Design a protein with these regions (language model features):
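Membrane-embedded alpha-helical segments of multi-pass membrane proteins
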Residues: 36-55, 96-108, 161-170, 211-218, ...
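Membrane-interfacial loop-to-transmembrane alpha-helix junctions, especially the N-terminal start
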Residues: 15-21, 59-74, 119-127, 186-190, ...
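Alpha-helical transmembrane segments of multi-pass inner-membrane proteins
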Residues: 3, 8, 79-83, 104, ...
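Loop-to-helix entry and N-terminal half of a specific, functionally important transmembrane alpha helix
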Residues: 19-27, 69, 193-194, 446-450, ...
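Transmembrane alpha-helices of multi-pass inner-membrane enzymes
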Residues: 44-50, 217, 470, 485-494, ...
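Interfacial transmembrane-helix termini
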Residues: 26-45, 58-65, 76-102, 112-122, ...
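Hydrophobic, aromatic-rich transmembrane alpha-helices
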Residues: 2-7, 24-28, 42-58, 168-180, ...
Length: 535
């Protein structure tokens, strides 16, 4: 197999410089796939850096790349947080280990001869390939096991963390082909792959990825609308696209929210005590759960419905659905309520066979058969919020649980606003908040699922502001903001961190630092490509 020249070790290149390049490829390759390989790669990087020696020269190089120091100083902030941690063993080790790359990756990138731009672009291509391959693997597994949940379409890491990489790859592949002056066919192919990945993302309905995707679209349109070098026509077109996009977003929110918050007068019970077969209805008047405005637990003739269901379905009325999830019965009640049907034989007879198959697959509302997955996910989020408002219990609802944790985290932050509860004190802080709220949720030892709140409760306002200033100084001093991929990565992270504490995990931290190192340290001082190399 013939490798392009820029992938081979160059004559004027040391072994350690080549190892650095290969390890960056490895990081990009394993970002969406293997936490172990990310750790192993970074260990090899550090061992090679130590073995290279020349520490005096490296100190000089670090002094010439002061932007790297700003990133490196993030780590000592969290080390300092150890000194006021309530429980020194409460995630302290994991909290620090996952932040070590803040210290090591910028240090190594600043003190070594950088790869040329052809190599840096190749690293980014490897990232796109890895993300695309992971999506293909997820789809293949779904064809083998159709009962798998949509979150399992990310087979190797959490869908929350893979989702941000997926959004990045969607836009990065287009930037790479345009920046490399690729052929017209290559550009068409890049748009095709980007489109396929976009469809995959929309079909998954992953809320964090959807929010990041919409945020990037908004950022790009704003950028075009206010870019000085653009023509008036182009800026006007971007403005029109912004208005259209905002209109579509509002339409999607209205369409999915209306059935959830629509509450018509409750149906009359008197005079409707019996089914057509003469069986008495049962009503849970204390349970006002609704589907499309209709009460779920009113007008139930359970024995009659059980008999009718078991005659038409191979799934037991009191058993599990196709996905193996308990309580198929509640899904039947919800679906029939969404259609405005009473829960009896007559109501079940009104359902088509395809609707029974949908119920067996866990579909709780007939509207979910008409909508694409991303609208379904938005509708589910509204429904969770409504149920949380109605009962005050977040159990079983992912978004409601996040809201409960955000409230608890804010309560904990209000108790210790300046320095927080310490680097390892996140569980202690959140438990305090949940107990103070007298939360009905029994789960404890959780994180707030919000990066901003996580920093506020662990290192306080002072630590949070310090980290924010250090990252801002890195961005401005390094000139990373001039590179579109870096800015897209920041938009993705900043939006996604509202719903997940991403930088408390290795994969998103490495994702952030890889792009920060490439565009904030290596790209500007990278040698100009040699003749025949990729851009």
């Amino acid at each position: 197999m013939h490798l392009p020249g820029y992938l081979k070790k160059q004559a004027d290149e040391s072994v350690h410089e080549y190892i650095f390049f290969v390890c960056l490829i490895s990081l990009a390759l394993f970002l969406p796939g293997s936490r172990f390989m990310q750790s192993f790669t970074q260990i090899i990087l550090f061992v090679s850096w130590i073995a290279d020696g020349n520490f005096r020269q490296k100190c000089i190089m670090l002094g010439q790349n002061r932007q790297a120091v700003f990133l490196m100083l993030v780590f000592p902030v969290f080390v300092a947080g150890m000194f006021w941690t309530y429980n020194a063993l409460d995630r302290l080790w994991l909290s620090l280990v996952d932040k070590v790359p803040f210290l090591t990756l910028p240090l190594m990138a600043a003190t070594i001869k950088p790869p040329n731009k052809a190599r840096l672009h190749f690293i980014l291509w490897v990232f796109v390939f890895s993300v695309s391959s992971t999506a293909a693997t997820g789809l293949l597994l779904h064809t083998i096991r159709p009962e798998m949940e949509l979150r399992e379409l990310s087979p190797f890491i959490s869908h929350l963390r893979y989702g941000i990489m997926l959004v990045m790859a969607i836009f990065l592949i287009i930037w790479l082909t345009h920046s490399s002056k690729a052929s017209h066919k290559s550009k068409i192919f890049s748009y095709f792959v980007s489109g396929v990945l976009s469809v995959f993302m929309l079909l998954t309905g992953w809320l964090t990825a959807l929010v990041s995707f919409v945020s990037v679209i908004g950022f790009l349109l704003l950028r075009e609308a206010f870019r000085k070098h653009n023509t008036s026509a182009r800026r006007a077109l971007a403005g029109m696209a912004m208005v259209l996009s905002a209109g579509l977003a509002v339409w999607g929110l209205v369409v999915t929210a209306r059935p959830v918050f629509y509450e018509p007068p409750l149906p009359h019970v008197q005079g409707n005590e019996l089914t057509r077969e003469g069986n008495a209805y049962w009503h849970d008047f204390q349970n006002l759960r609704r589907e499309n405005g209709n009460p779920v637990y009113w007008f139930i003739a359970e024995d009659e419905l059980r008999e009718a269901w078991n005659q038409r379905s191979t799934f037991c009325f009191d058993g599990k659905d196709f996905r193996g999830i308990e309580n198929l019965k509640s899904t039947i009640f919800r679906y029939m309520a969404s259609r405005g049907l009473r829960k009896d034989r007559e109501g079940l007879d009104a359902l088509q066979d395809y609707e029974l198959r949908a119920i067996e697959n866990g579909v709780p509302n007939y509207l979910h058969l008409q909508w694409p997955q991303f609208l379904i996910r938005i509708h589910q989020s509204f429904w969770e919020i409504q149920e949380y408002r109605r009962t005050g219990d977040p159990e079983g609802f992912s978004l409601a649980q996040r809201i409960e944790l955000w409230r608890a985290a804010w309560k904990a932050f209000s108790e210790k606003p300046l320095l927080g509860w310490g680097t390892g004190g996140v569980h202690t802080a959140v438990n305090f908040g949940l107990d103070s709220m007298e939360s009905r949720w029994e789960m404890r030892d959780l994180k707030p699922h919000n990066q901003y709140l996580l920093y506020l409760i662990t290192i306080g306002t002072i630590g949070f502001a310090t980290v924010a200033v250090l990252i801002f100084m890195f961005i401005t001093k390094s000139g990373a903001y001039r590179h579109l991929p870096f800015m897209l990565m920041m938009v993705i992270l900043l939006s996604a961190m509202a719903g997940e504490d991403l930088l408390d995990f290795q994969e998103p931290t490495t994702f952030f630092l890889l792009f920060a190192v490439i565009f904030g340290i290596l790209y500007e001082k990278s040698p100009i490509k040699e003749k025949g190399e990729l851009s």
